[in-house]
Amino acid sequence: MFINGDYRGCYLLIESVKRNKDCRINVDKTSGYIVERDPYWWKENRFFTTNYFASSKGYRWTWKYPDEDDVLLEQEDYITQFINDTEQSILNGTYSNYIDIKSFAKWILAHDILGSKDSGGTNLYVAKYDDTPNSLLEMPVLWDFDSNFRMEPGEFSKCHNNAGDFYFYNLFNNTNNSFTSKYKELWLQIKPTLLSTITQYILSITDSEYGRALESSRMLHYNRWGYTPYETIGELAQEAINWFNNHLDKLDVNINKLADNTSISAIKTKEKYDVYNLLGNKVYKPKKGIYIKNKRKIIYH
């Protein structure tokens, strides 16, 4: 951007997260909700908390829709209670009644593919179409891409495994396998063409007018603030392609290791085994119950 001939930097203009009847956040105008899980809640005039995040991290929820000035007390009470019920359902395995599993699975799969090392703080949005029992809690949009490619190749994103960041750790480690199964299903659908699609998209940017403009802006940027020029746009694009080449095959191995328990048979036994519970934790003094042995469900009594 130039102002009166003076270069001021390179900016990306994008639409903010808001209700829009023509896009993925098409919540009902009178009874819909869009809220942000927000570590900077204290900057807002209105916010609310739920049980899962009322801990040391102190995350709160802030309003995207309705606007905070228009929120009625009964609306705040409703969405607070619904999210509290959702959080409890994730812990007890009944989450299928509360969340849109596909949208949650797509959200975390995208960040796993991108190797995001953040994505668990601010800019994390959920929506509910209306205040009826028929609508579920959704994750309609991805956000926060400044930490992509920072995980080691093959590693899941930070938000995947960190129980304090969001709900995903508990969704993957759950007696209800619906979430893990959907996640793996989505991965299998895109895996065959994913690398070629990403590669073609990256190369299309470097060869475009947009890419050439970025290259020019890069040099202007470094000249303005005295930085030493780093790689060209083409070199950065090749680095990204190389990273995906290294990352996706290893990620596939780790995804295949996720337990969805879809083909487990049950047997009864009184024999002594090293056993694991359904969350994959080794049990040193087994009690009566259901355990896993060599991918088989064992009823221990």
Q: Where do the model's predicted regions map?
A:
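Internal "kinase-insert"/substrate-recognition segments embedded within catalytic cores
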Residues: 3-109, 117, 206
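Residue-level signal for well-ordered, solvent-exposed loop/turn and beta-edge residues enriched
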Residues: 6, 134-135, 281, 296
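Middle-to-C-terminal accessory/interaction subdomains
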Residues: 64-121, 127-129, 134-261
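Residue-level detector of functionally pivotal "anchor" positions at catalytic/ligand-binding pockets or at interdomain
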Residues: 253-279
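C-terminal tail/sorting-segment detector
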Residues: 290-301
